[in-house]
């Protein structure tokens, strides 16, 4: 009878260790990748674009985003460099997309359309190392 209890205890301990290991592996695999809004911008009407530039930071912050790059120097390695480059970081691709699709941002992106030529992308980033 004592041997049966030891075997049962061993099986239970092994099962708990297995569940704990599987949970740890799953939590590593379930890491949320950051999301980025990336824009190439050529401002055609600086005065109107300034109105957009003043309003957009509040919409970004509302979705947990922050600027990684906002203008500044650009050096071309291959191809033509954009006049202005912007990278905005979010906690996830979904948060970045939610910002882009939000009514807050939707209310002002027409200002950008009227004052600049741009290409804007939402991309999923790599996990932090």
Segments predicted by a language model, with ranges:
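Short S/T/G/P-rich N-terminal loop/turn motif that feeds into the first structured element of a domain
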Residues: 5-10, 14-103, 124-129
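Short arginine-rich
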Residues: 105-122
